[in-house]
């Protein structure tokens, strides 16, 4: 298992050579993924940013840093293959879920759901509940889904593409449904990255509480 300090050092290798202006851009981009107060924008350092990323996304910190770097038009490959958590949940654990619990990360749940949709894997009870949002998206966003598909076919990605989802209490679930429809076309990994980019931590937490209450 990779120790946390080793992971921090690996991430720091990508940040240490950034200019001050580039780092400011990185901080601005990080606000989509991390809780940053107004004070953080002027006082946060590269070391503390790395610590925040590792703390918030222990299993996906490499992916988060790679997404953030895209704002600088830099495509980086952060080589961290080993899970930081001592007992990672295997994929089969998600396949048989019948309800959401506090110890399950919503990002893990969404990533596996998108993969099941892309690979046409039978859904368990909890995923069937989530899948109702995909059916709703097919009915409500047929034109918009076509436009998103055209964009992807032209550019090969959906990074920074504006999803046609109104911001309201259903924003997270509707975004999941929309991206689930696209998952077989764009691939579950890119669908998941778009979810991480587009849906804030606050909205994810609200949706997780909603799932846990059902």
UniProtKB/Swiss-Prot annotation:
Entries under InterPro entries matching the protein: Orthopox_C1, Poxvirus_Bcl-2-like
Keyword terms, alphabetized: Early protein
Pfam families associated with the record: Poxv_Bcl-2-like
Induction conditions: Expressed in the early phase of the viral replicative cycle.
Highest rank taxon of the organism: Viruses
Family membership noted in the UniProt record: Belongs to the orthopoxvirus OPG034 family.
Designated name of the protein: Protein OPG034
Species name: Monkeypox virus
